């Protein structure tokens, strides 16, 4: 098949492009390089089935494709708060433009949504039928609300225009090709540990997250697109739950770093806990993560070690 990946030069997008090529598909990678990087897909450029286009999804484009994976959007607080208007426009206008294309060329389209649609959840773990406990005017809202609007658009294009949609909600994902200045906790802790800097925990370290290794996540994407039973939304994440302090200690042990852990005030709007219920993914997609946190961290640490060596 001919597949389009928006945000294809980003962390997740580059891994998805790689997987789709390995599965025998033709791949068009679309990216504006706001957070995506050419180096993430440089190893794919000699592949005859791979095409790279510099384009911003807030502008319309028409391509003949069979499948669209809509991943384009800054996904770390540092990046989406740097330009919040651009962030929400990318989610909303990007969804409108990609759905319009899917409608015209009759392509199946997947929206990479997020666990952030649940806000600071009052239900734990989060199931897909939970509507969330959200702040529409906070500093993270440009990302959270943009993704919620995108889900609404996907459902309405499906109901009104019969567009063939799929929606996945991504929980915290980590792995090689994360940006070093990403601002997300896994990359922060690893880079700080490798540089011998203090490891910064915001709050008292008791807030929890669930960390899914990138290969597991991409497998979930592929299974979601390849089945005809459900359109979603479906939670894709690792239900193993860790506190920030547990993660910091694990990183210190694996890196052998002498870094100290320091505590700083928790930013506003930061969810206290986040963990997916993946019963639907297990049942409908026969999917669950296979890579434990320790193994995934080891692979990610090797990546950042190589990066820091230059």
Predicted feature descriptions by range:
Residues 1-173, 215, 299, 303, ...:
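N-terminal Rossmann-like NAD(P)+-binding domain of SDR-like oxidoreductases, especially those catalyzing
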Residues 16, 55-56, 172, 191-310:
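C-terminal substrate-binding subdomain of Rossmann-fold SDR/epimerase-dehydratase oxidoreductases
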Residues 36, 63, 180, 242, ...:
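Residues that form or flank phosphate/diphosphate-binding pockets in enzymes
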Residues 38-41, 151, 187, 245, ...:
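Short, surface-exposed alpha-helical segments at coil->helix boundaries
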Residues 82-83, 177-182:
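Short, solvent-exposed loop/turn segments at secondary-structure boundaries
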Residues 88, 178-179, 210-213:
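Nucleotide-sugar-dependent glycosyltransferase donor-binding/catalytic pocket residues
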Residues 91, 146, 182-183, 274:
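Short, conserved glycine- and acidic-residue-centered signature motifs
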Residues 124-125, 180-188:
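A glycine/serine/threonine-rich, flexible loop-to-helix segment
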